[in-house]
Design a protein with these regions (language model features):
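Residue-level signal for inorganic ion chemistry
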Residues: 62, 120, 159, 208, ...
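Conserved beta-strand segments of alpha/beta enzyme cores
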Residues: 179, 262, 379, 413-415
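Conserved adenylate-forming
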Residues: 165-285
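Conserved AMP-binding/adenylate-forming
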Residues: 238, 242, 247-333, 346-347
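Conserved beta-strand termini and adjacent loop/short-helix elements that scaffold enzyme active sites
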Residues: 162, 266-268, 298, 383, ...
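Nucleotide 5′-phosphate-binding alpha/beta core
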Residues: 1-119, 126-141, 145-157, 165, ...
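AMP-binding/adenylate-forming catalytic core of the ANL superfamily
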Residues: 208, 314-412
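Conserved beta-strand elements of the Class I
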Residues: 158-160, 307
Length: 435
């Protein structure tokens, strides 16, 4: 039923879809949606107790039902039958993507509990297939709606969604399941201005949702092409939901300060082991949902690694799974309370002439380069250690971009290339570091 809804959701005409869109989420996603919706508001103590209980169940189940965990736990010398407290969890061996990749999907999974196959890691060069559990959609959307509700969102509200979905030659199409208008991120706005004007003026759009880079590109292009239409849209919008990418300061400053819009971001990943929204919109501090999974900050030299357990997925268990992200954590009573992303799983860093790993967040966004006043996007490519190529997307014709960047005291040979449009992934994301 849930999969069928997804397949037909963007084929139903707006007038019919608008009526269907009023159907309560509990009827679309079943009783599980209500259950998770209640869990998002459960008491801290009950959620912590539930986490411990679920982790115990997951370990025993995985050890008996999957070849991978039977081997993995034995190989690491873990033979405890149960854990009594959170202090016992660090004794459970950490699992990395490379560990999973040594085994087939069937050896890591219990197929009878699966809803569908999913995958992750396409941009990191480490693909991994896994199964989502049958309650995955209910779990995901109950928590996503809880995040958006902090800005006032209701599921009957209309929104624009700007990501990388291929919708053919159309500028937009309606998807009743999320009551959203999917914008074609690849379609030139100038050539589709009439369709854009019809959408903005005739529909009651209250929210924008999408990749930060895509939302930024759309709003900036609209402002340059039709300033009046831009103002009309901004006057309607109550907030912006920034997902699937790290919201780079350049993008967020434009959305919040220039456009005057509230925004909220969250940390999540395809494996669905941890979901952590901002409690204070715009803060960049993420608080994991205890009703979604169990998140830890595990020391790694001078840093901490984000490790997570998907407490609800018994189809392909993820137990103490290394997400690949480095974080700056805050602890409460010895447990992870919240965190900032220090270095992402996509390893957005480059190697300088001295062989040191340099964070691109600081190198590009921490130096207040004047180039940001003259460009739409800045991306980086590293052809060799000590060398970086700066790719600038701009409508200005400049002979030299070097004077607008400050790379003083940085040990790199820097070259510059100007582009008409940014380099995007197959899904339409604009990544800072190109590989």
């Amino acid at each position: 039923m849930k999969e069928a809804l997804k397949k037909i959701a963007d084929q139903i005409p707006y007038p019919i879809g608008k009526l269907l869109g009023k159907t309560p989420m509990s009827l679309r996603l079943g009783h599980d949606y209500q259950t998770f919706n209640k869990l998002t508001n459960a008491s801290f103590l009950s959620l912590r107790n539930s986490q411990l209980e679920q982790i115990n169940k997951l370990i025993q189940f995985s050890r008996h039902e999957t070849v991978f965990y039977r081997d993995h736990l034995k190989e690491k010398g873990y033979n405890h039958k149960s854990i009594e407290a959170f202090e016992d969890i660090p004794s459970i061996p950490i699992t990395r993507k490379s560990d999973f990749q040594r085994y087939t999907l069937d050896e890591r999974s219990v197929r009878r509990l699966a809803l569908k196959k999913s995958n992750t890691g396409g941009t990191t060069g480490q693909p991994l297939d896994f199964y989502l559990e049958k309650t995955a959609y209910a779990r995901e959307w109950a928590h996503m709606h809880a995040i958006w509700a902090t800005l006032g969102y209701r599921y009957t509200d209309e929104k624009i969604t700007i990501r990388g979905k291929n919708i053919g030659n159309r500028f937009y199409k309606y998807n009743f399941n999320q009551n959203e208008f999917l914008i074609n991120a690849y379609a030139p706005l100038q050539e589709n201005l009439d369709a854009c004007r019809e959408l903005i003026t005739k529909r009651n759009i209250r929210w924008i949702h999408g990749y930060p880079s895509s939302v930024y590109s759309f709003l900036r292009e609209l402002e340059s092409v039709d300033a009046l239409l831009f103002e009309i849209l901004i006057s309607k919008i109550q907030g912006v939901f920034l997902g699937s990418e790290y919201p780079a300061p350049q993008y967020r400053n434009y959305i919040e300060q220039h456009c005057g819009l509230k925004s909220i971001s969250w940390y999540g990943h395809s494996e669905m082991a941890v979901l952590a929204p901002e409690r204070e919109p715009g803060s960049g501090v993420y608080y994991p949902f205890h009703s979604y999974g169990y998140a830890e900050a595990v020391p790694d030299g001078d840093s901490y690694r984000l490790v997570a357990t998907s407490t609800h997925n018994f189809a392909t268990p993820f137990i103490r799974y290394d997400t690949g992200d480095l974080i700056d954590p805050t602890f409460k009573d010895g447990l992870l309370e919240c965190f900032r992303i220090k270095e992402g799983r996509n390893s957005d860093s480059v190697i300088d002439k001295n062989g040191r790993s340099i964070s691109l967040t600081g190198l590009i966004f921490g130096r207040h380069h004047q180039a940001f006043d003259h460009s739409e996007h800045v991306q980086v490519r590293q052809p060799a250690p000590g060398k970086i190529e700066i790719l600038v997307t701009s409508k200005e014709n400049r002979e030299s971009w070097a004077e607008l960047f400050d790379f003083s005291n940085a040990f790199f040979d820097v070259s510059f290339t100007q582009l008409e449009s940014p380099v995007r992934t197959p899904l339409g994301k604009v990544q800072l570091l190109l590989r």
